[in-house]
Amino acid sequence: MQSIGIKGMGYYVPENVFTNFDFEKIIDTSDEWIRTRTGIIERRFASKDQATSDLATEASLKAIKNAKISKEDVDMIILATTTADYIAQGAACIVQNKLGLKKIPCFDLNAACTGFIYGLEVAYSLVKSGLYKNILVIGAETLSRIVDMQNRNTCVLFGDGAAAAIIGEVEKGYGFLGFSIGAEGEDNMILKVPAGGSKKPNNEETIKNRENFVIMKGQDVFKFAVSTLPKVTSDALEKAKLKVNDLSMVFPHQANLRIIESAAKRMKFPLEKFYMNLSRYGNTSSASVGIALGEAIEKGLVKKGDNIALTGFGGGLTYGSTIIKWAY
């Protein structure tokens, strides 16, 4: 049976660092308040001339290089994002153009912070079908464009960044071992941008009421996350026919330190085996899990044969996890 996995990873974060002390200058908050409640110290913000597709392209070039393939070997692009360059056009098509590729199918996928994991399962299924050989999966966001810099409860949480993976055939016995994804649509109002869509188009009133920015019911998100992360990871492990102690490392969605700590306790898995970089990048939504994995690979923390879990949750509400036996 064909084994399918990640052939190469890449990630990119903008150069502009925005610290908690920078927030102290513009809103009523403090480094201590942010750090103790979230675990975040700083985050990256895209420059004025950078769009989501620009970040995605940078990460993609690194993934292609690390997969040791040429750009022309890529036969599909899937871009998970909530912050596409334009409303009526998929940013994946813009990435295709920036990479200098032609004709290959490209589409955006919106599963909020779980988007990268959703994209991995879609790519896995398409490669398994035999229709495609090397699918580029990207998670990319410019969340700084949709956060309200007057709302201290949300603006301090988010950052910009991108991660990309090449999905294709890997050495037999390695690669994806199990997936679990799902959604609870009845909770769709917990995390959203109220205006700007077909339900409530932007107008003078929505802009005045600051409805074109992210709003979030923090306590509801916390409760959902700490209960869902262990369950969805356990389900993916069951499909992979593994136990939690078979894992070398877990790469959780980088939303909040307290969420990750609570999930670790419920999973009865050592916190030190949860890779975390949210202190430096904040919550980059669909990019967060991929950025964490890409960074860990660069540091030599992920080795061939390691069993790792990628797990996340997001607006929708969505959730997902995949278990991978690392192939290189």
Swiss-Prot record:
Gene3D superfamilies: 3.40.47.10. Residues 254-258 are annotated as: ACP-binding. Pathway: Lipid metabolism; fatty acid biosynthesis. Belongs to the thiolase-like superfamily. FabH family. GO terms for biological process: fatty acid biosynthetic process. Keywords: Acyltransferase, Cytoplasm, Fatty acid biosynthesis, Fatty acid metabolism, Lipid biosynthesis, Lipid metabolism, Multifunctional enzyme, Transferase. Catalyzes the condensation reaction of fatty acid synthesis by the addition to an acyl acceptor of two carbons from malonyl-ACP. Catalyzes the first condensation reaction which initiates fatty acid synthesis and may therefore play a role in governing the total rate of fatty acid production. Possesses both acetoacetyl-ACP synthase and acetyl transacylase activities. Its substrate specificity determines the biosynthesis of branched-chain and/or straight-chain of fatty acids. This is Beta-ketoacyl-[acyl-carrier-protein] synthase III. Pfam families: ACP_syn_III, ACP_syn_III_C. It comes from Fusobacterium nucleatum subsp. nucleatum (strain ATCC 25586 / DSM 15643 / BCRC 10681 / CIP 101130 / JCM 8532 / KCTC 2640 / LMG 13131 / VPI 4355). It comes from the Bacteria. The last Arg residue of the ACP-binding site is essential for the weak association between ACP/AcpP and FabH. It catalyses: malonyl-[ACP] + acetyl-CoA + H(+) = 3-oxobutanoyl-[ACP] + CO2 + CoA. GO terms for molecular function: 3-oxoacyl-[acyl-carrier-protein] synthase activity; beta-ketoacyl-acyl-carrier-protein synthase III activity. GO terms for cellular component: cytoplasm. CDD domains: KAS_III.
